[in-house]
C-alpha cells in the first residue's frame, strides 16, 4: 500500500520537476533539494518526529478530536494509517528520484508531436510519457518495495505502530532480540527474502523490463 501511495504521489512531483520545471532551472534545483533533504536527517529521528507530532495529546490530534474528525477516545499513533503514512514519507525519495531521472530524459518533442497529431493529453500520457518512464517506475517501485517489506521501525510500538500493526520485520526482530528464538527468526528471514525475490522477478517480467535485473 505504501509503495502504491508513493508512486501516486511521486509521479506528478517527478513529472513537474523533470518536465515542467525545465524552463526554470532554479526552481528545478530547489525542488530536487527539497526531495533529497530528508536524507540529511536520520531515519529514526524523522520517524520519531512524526510520532511526537501525532502523539495522543498533540495539537493535531486534539484539534481533529474537537472538529469531530476523530472520536474523543480515538488516536492516530498505533494505527495502520500512521504506519502507512510513515512508510510512504520515509521512502518517497527512493521513488521520486528514479522517476525524475526517466522523465528528465524525456524528449519534449515527442510530446509536442503527439499534440500535433491531435492526441488529447490523456492519450499523449498513456502512449508516450508512461511507456518512456516505465524504467523509472520499475526502479522506483523496487527501491521502495524491498526496504518497506523488511521494515520494522515504522510499525514498532516505540514509533508509529503498535502490537496490532506489526509487520513481518517486527516479528523477525522480536524472535531475534526478545524471544531468542533464532531458528524461527532465521526461517522467517529466509521466507521473506524468497517472497521478495519471487515478487520482484514476477513484477519485472510482467512489465517487460527484464534487463533491469
Model-derived features with residue positions:
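Membrane-embedded alpha-helical segments of multi-pass transporters/permeases
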Residues: 7, 11, 15, 44-47, ...
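Transmembrane alpha-helices
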Residues: 4, 89-109, 119-151
Amino acid at each position: 500500500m505504501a509503495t502504491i501511495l508513493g508512486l501516486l504521489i511521486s509521479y506528478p512531483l517527478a513529472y513537474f520537476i523533470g518536465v515542467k520545471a525545465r524552463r526554470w532551472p532554479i526552481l528545478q534545483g530547489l525542488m530536487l533539494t527539497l526531495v533529497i533533504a530528508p536524507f540529511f536527517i536520520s531515519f529514526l529521528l524523522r520517524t520519531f518526529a512524526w510520532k511526537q507530532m501525532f502523539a495522543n495529546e498533540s495539537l493535531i490530534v486534539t484539534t481533529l478530536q474537537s472538529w469531530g474528525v476523530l472520536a474523543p477516545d480515538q488516536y492516530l499513533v498505533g494505527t495502520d494509517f500512521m504506519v502507512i503514512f510513515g512508510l510512504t514519507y520515509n521512502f518517497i525519495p527512493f521513488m521520486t528520484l528514479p522517476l525524475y531521472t526517466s522523465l528528465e530524459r524525456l524528449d519534449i518533442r515527442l510530446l509536442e508531436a503527439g499534440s500535433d497529431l491531435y492526441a488529447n493529453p490523456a492519450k499523449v500520457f498513456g502512449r508516450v510519457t508512461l511507456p518512456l518512464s516505465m524504467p523509472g517506475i520499475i526502479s522506483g517501485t523496487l527501491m521502495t518495495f524491498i526496504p518497506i517489506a523488511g521494515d520494522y521501525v515504522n510499525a514498532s510500538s516505540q514509533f508509529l505502530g503498535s502490537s496490532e500493526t506489526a509487520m513481518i520485520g517486527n516479528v523477525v526482530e522480536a524472535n531475534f532480540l526478545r524471544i531468542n528464538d533464532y531458528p524461527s527468526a532465521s526461517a522467517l528471514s529466509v521466507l521473506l527474502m524468497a517472497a521478495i525475490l519471487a515478487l520482484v522477478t514476477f513484477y519485472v517480467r510482467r512489465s517487460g523490463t527484464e534487463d533491469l535485473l
